[in-house]
Structure formats: structure tokens, C-alpha cells
Amino acid sequence: MNNLTVIARENCIYCRLAIRLLEEKGLKFELLMLGVDFEREEFQSLAPGAKTFPQILVNGVSIGGYEDLLEKVDSIC
């Protein structure tokens, strides 16, 4: 089973879509919210090179954002 993490922020439609997709697929994941679980300064240490939200991590490695998740979700299951 893969370890999934969603790095998200409030008022982000793609963050909500990613969370909904994972929930609909019945996948368990850790949710890290900007301003609650980490601060903006920590974002790069969580997802090096990332510039947008959400960031989806599979086993600690970023696979990208929502569009990337859509392409890869079936292989993650």
C-alpha cells in the first residue's frame, strides 16, 4: 500500500478536487494544510521544486498536482 500525502491550502479548488478524488477511490491519505500543519516557508522542504497547490506525495515523492493525480490515480490504488 502506498503512503499518500496531500499538501493543500484553503480556498483551493484543485486541492478540494484532489481530496475528493482520493476519498472517492477509497484511498487513505495524510492531509497537510498551509497555515495549520506547516507555514509557507516550509513548503519547499515538503515538496522541493513545487510552486502550486495541491502537491501529491506518494511514498514521500511528489507526483505533481491535481492533473498529475488524475493521470496516475489508478496506478496508485
Sequence positions of predicted segments:
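Local sequence-structure signature of Cys/Sec-based thiol-disulfide redox active-site neighborhoods
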Residues: 1-28
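Conserved residues at beta->alpha junctions
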Residues: 9, 34, 60
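Short alpha-helical
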Residues: 13, 38, 64
